[in-house]
């Protein structure tokens, strides 16, 4: 049994005319049914493209191209859950360094042959997005199920951005409270929360108006 988040026709395609025409660039990728693919081009060396490939028959893995996608070579069997993660980010300075978003972030320093976890002490897990400062590759912003975190030392210490009230909502409902109805939402990893639709003060809604439902 294999879960694959794709189907016939899945693969990588390349355009050199701004999207007017496309060609497949799948030489070296698995010849079986392919699912979700995370891909990034190395700013340090644009000839290099990395791809993390979900595929049937346990043939997925981490792939590397050194000729702008014309051919691919499997570096390792590293994959994540294609239905929730599978995003990668190449370091803008070091062409051999790539970060994988997953429950816990991981990093390769040898072009995908081996990986180790990035330090995430006092940080929420389930990572999905990353920005690496092109002028200082120790400075990152990472988006995860718990919000946005910043580090200036490659993950040794993290700063949570408390002024950005972001989370993932799955379901929203309202009640019949008066004078203002409450809004409730079920979130990913962060309970079900509720709060008023309006308040009787000139400052408007603030974080203290929200509560965890029981």
Each predicted region: which residue ranges?
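Beta-propeller blade termini and top-face loops
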Residues: 1-214
